[in-house]
Amino acid sequence: MKSYEFDIASNLRIQHSIETIKILKKYFKNEVFIRGNCDQAPFSLACSIRTPAFFMMDLMMEEEKAIRLIEYTTDMCARVVRIMAEAGADMVSNGDSPAGPNMISPDMYKRFAFPYERRMLEEAHLQGVPYLLHICGNTDRILQSLATMNLDAVELDYKTPLENICKFLGNRMTLFGTVDPSGVMALGTTDDVRRETQKILDIYYGNPRLVIGAGCAIPPIA
């Protein structure tokens, strides 16, 4: 498989992110906490390059080539982490939703996603910033794996039982979430938002490792 080298920092969207972080940092200084969203983690980026259907087949039939692609995307993702940190982000994050149990088994997650997510965490720490990992869907079957990664923060979906998140991750890392972004934030009422927020507060009562928000991207109609 041929690898292609290019200057990620010259990408227009990356340039917009860099400039936005710099403007916010200059204006607010340390008054606000800036999360630099580096978007896709290595497994997810490889999935996007090949398309989900083809990449799932690659994992089963062309494992060596699939791993080479993930190694390549790991390098690309690490560069974005460095760029965001150098721009002034207080924290960086990646999303790896295709690596969740809704798409692949927990065993496949441990082989093809977990090691590369951990390398993103290590890269962030080398840059002196905390790291957040986002995974959509029901992550119940990989919570114990996540607990061993020493993440600073995790952003999980409403589909994962909050009691289990608190049990396995509550004393290890900060939780961002887990309000339903569509059913509650976009289509629900203010009472629905208040009720779901209170449920989260009740379960995490006494635990400061919580930042309440949507567990995934909020639709623009919200």
What are these regions (language model features)?
Residues 2-222:
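Active-site loop segments of alpha/beta catalytic cores
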